[in-house]
Structure formats: structure tokens, C-alpha cells
From Swiss-Prot:
Catalyzes the reversible transfer of the terminal phosphate group between ATP and AMP. Plays an important role in cellular energy homeostasis and in adenine nucleotide metabolism. Its EC number is 2.7.4.3. Residues 126-132 are annotated as: LID. Residues 30-59 are annotated as: NMP. It comes from Corynebacterium diphtheriae (strain ATCC 700971 / NCTC 13129 / Biotype gravis). The keyword ATP-binding applies. The gene is adk. One of its GO terms (cellular component) is cytoplasm. This is Adenylate kinase.
Amino acid sequence: MRLVLLGPPGAGKGTQAAILSEKLRIPHISTGDLFRANIGEGTPLGKEAKSYIDAGKLVPTDVTARMVKARLQKDDAEVGFLLDGFPRTVEQAEILKEMLKGFGVELNGVINYEVAEDVVVERMLARGRADDNEDTIRTRLQVYRDETAPLIRHYGDDIITIKAEGSIEDINARTLGALGK
């Protein structure tokens, strides 16, 4: 199964991805993890990404896409994957589509975890991270909405919307049910 995971910060994508990865026996591929791994290993792509991150800039789409492509070419991703953090834009969605076409496959679906803003704020404040204050969280949510709304429209009928409120187990059951698992 080849899936993209969407949802605002604090929606529980990482938590659900870990459970789904184990249950579906497919890798969870997070762009954040890819950046950290490539930078940590000192790969050419990692060095390129680090130069942008160190300058406080976003890593360009082409660098991120090359990291994703390299990761998708590994053996464990042949049977499927959960992609988290890419695509973030319609342009990236088109790049992913072409990339997968080159592998002779396509996405099986796009899971969009929906959660009320107040629930996200509450969850993120409860994590106790230094950079998580209410104003910062609400700003991040607005940026997410602005970036992702066109992507959700782009995927249209391929979107599988999951209400990401309630227990971790309930959310996982809803996700697996929507996937027919």
C-alpha cells in the first residue's frame, strides 16, 4: 500500500504512522527523518540540505524530492510506504506522481487527519516543548492550512479523511477501517 499522510501539526500523524507501519508492514518515510539521516551521515544531499537549514531557509523541493526518491528506491519500500511530510504543495504532488510513474506504481490513497484547532493546541501544549506556546502553535496551524488547502483540493476524491480525535486506538481503527484493513 502506497499512502501519503496529511494533517496539521499535533494531529498524531507520527503516532499513527508508527502503528500503521507495523500493522501494514510498510516503512514510514518522514521527510524530517530523511533530513536528519542524510545530514547525520554527511551525504551529498544531506550537506546540501544542511546549508539551507543552517541559513534558516526551507530546503528546496528538488533536494527534498531527490531524498524521497532515493528512499523510495530501497527494497523495503517496494511493497508500499507511508509518506509523511512530502508532498506539501501541489508542485510536490506532481513531482511525486511522476516519480512513482517512473517506478511503475501509483498512490493507493491520501489520508488526511482532521482535528479541531483547540484540540491541537491542547495536545501540543501538553507536550511541553519550549517552542510550543499557543501563539506559535496557532501560527503553525494557519501556515499548514494555507499550504495544504490547495493540496487537498488537488487530491480531491483520493483523499481519505479521518477524524483524528479520541484515543490513539480509535483513530487507528478508523484509519484501518477506511483502508479496508
